[in-house]
Structure formats: structure tokens, C-alpha cells
Amino acid sequence: RQDRIYINPEERINYIFNSSIKGIENSDLILLVGSNPRLEASILNARIRKAYLKNNTKIYSIGDPGDLTYPYEVIGSNTTIVKLIAAGSHEISEKIKKSKKPIIIIGESALYGEAGRYIFETIKKFLFTNNFIRDDWNALNVLTQQASRVGAIDLGLYSIAKNENFPFFDKLDNGSFKFIYLLGADDINFQKDDKFIVYQGSHGDKGAEIADIVLPGAAYTEKNGLFVNLEGKIQNAYKASYPPGDAREDWKIIKDLSKMLKKTEDYKDIHELQKNIKKNITIKNNNNLKNTKIVEFIEKEISIKPIDYYFTNSIARSSKTMNECRRVKKKFLFTGIEKAS
């Protein structure tokens, strides 16, 4: 993670889109929680629109995302609404209970900070109690904004203490670290001060600018690899061209660093590495115990954070086309995304 987004890695259903994108069309009720799917996942938003047009699916939102291209009802914008839903004292509670295939989509804006834990765990418990987390239909869905987030959680690349979800960020803020290794991490905010920073990545973005050492890596188009999508499915990515200059594939850089540090690896080549990754994900996928937690209430506004649509990653920020799109967009006071007043 590069931000304080709450994650519960205990079981895989906690951080993927369980209902599936295709399953949206079968839903009879959709509740958005701190999410703007039009900007965060345009294809997913198109499916929601299709569900509305085809099935007249009712759509509700906690937080106001603006124009989503289909009608919806804002039922509130704070964690009190979540509390009322869980207690069964909000009118939407009964509508969810009476629906056959409801979908709850929790966005990163709702998961930010300590309140994110309350929102997620409370909604999960409500759905589990009402039998909406089962093998044939799981209404719990997390909409991530980072393409690598699901895969990173699958591999255990996170820092979580027993009773603390953000120990890494706390240490980062108080200056506990003297050495930081940024693996393609360009959106993490901290003061460099006297920290020694190594950056490994494909584009000379924010991370490279503050680094003491840069290890040039291959872009996703310049290497074979695996991606885990929103639904938790593993997808293969194939090399379209070779990396320029001294740039190398990420796994080769890490393997050489391991040798220098005299650390042993359980793989010899990329095929063995990918085999181990798939095995690890399969084990985690079969470990869904459907655990629920009771979390102390935290009152907080659920405001949907704006997205710099054309500048969401380092590759987009280095694109001349994306820069031009961003420049043109800034000229318009009304973009079509906002609601007309």
C-alpha cells in the first residue's frame, strides 16, 4: 500500500470483487459505499448502467459521486448510515434483505483511515448475518484503484500488526526508517530527510526523483508477467518489446540482490517463480473462512476523493497524450462528471 487504505488479508474475499463484473447484470440492488465507479472502473460502471437499463436495478450510494450516467439515490454521507444499516434501522436494510442478489461495492474513499476498518467489517458482518456471503453469491465487493493491489496482498506484501493496520505509515511519519526501497512506488508521500532511498521502476517518476540509487526496470509491456485482476483471477501478460538500455525485468533485479545478500530463493527462473506464485494464490483462495469482526464505531464523513483521471500512474504521467488530455480537461469548468446544479 502507498496510502492508509484498510485491508484485511485474513481471507481473500476481503479484498476482491466477489460478485464478479458479469454478476452485476444479475443484481437487483446495488449499494455504492464511498465509490465513483465511473472514474475508478469505467467498464464496471458500464455494467451497472446496463443492469439499470435492462433490469431497472435500484442503485443507492453512501457519498455523492456525481454523474454516473444512470440514476441513483444518495442515502447519506457518513459512517452513521453504515451503523443504521447494520442495526436494521435504516430503510435500505430491509430492501437489501428482501433482494435476491444485492451487491455492495466499497470504494477506497470509504476504506481510508481508521474508519475504513469499521465500515468494511460492519458491512461484511451485516451481509454474512443475512446470508449474502455464500458460495453461490457473495455480495461483498472491494473496488481498488491500483492495478497491483490485489496481487500484492495475495503475495503478502503488506505491513499489518495484530491490532494496528498502519504500522508502516506510522513509522514512516515519525522518521523511524533510514533506508527505503521503492518498488515502482511513486505515489507514497513522505519527507526524504536523511533517508537513503533505492528506486526500482520503469519510468523516471516521483520515486526516481528523490532516489539515491535508481535500478531501471522493465515496463509491463517489456516483460512476461502475471496480473491479478479485480475479481482475483490470474491473467498472463506477454512481452511486446524489449526494455531499453540497462533496464531489466524486476524478478532478475531482485534475484541478483538476493544473491548479493546471500539469501536463498526457491526458484531458478521465471517459470518456477510463477508456479510458486500460482500455488500460493490457490492456497489462499481455498482459505475463505468467512470470519467476521465486531469493530468499535467511528464517526466520520464518507467523502469521495477526486481522481486526477489522466494522471493515475507513472506511465500516464509520462505520456504526451495524457498530458494533453489533462490540460484540455482543466479548461472546462463543467466536465460532465459533476451533477448539474
Regions found by a protein language model. Give the residues of each.
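Long, low-complexity segments enriched in small/aliphatic residues
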Residues: Q274-S341
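Non-catalytic alpha/beta scaffold blocks inside enzyme catalytic domains
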Residues: Q2-K290, L333-S341
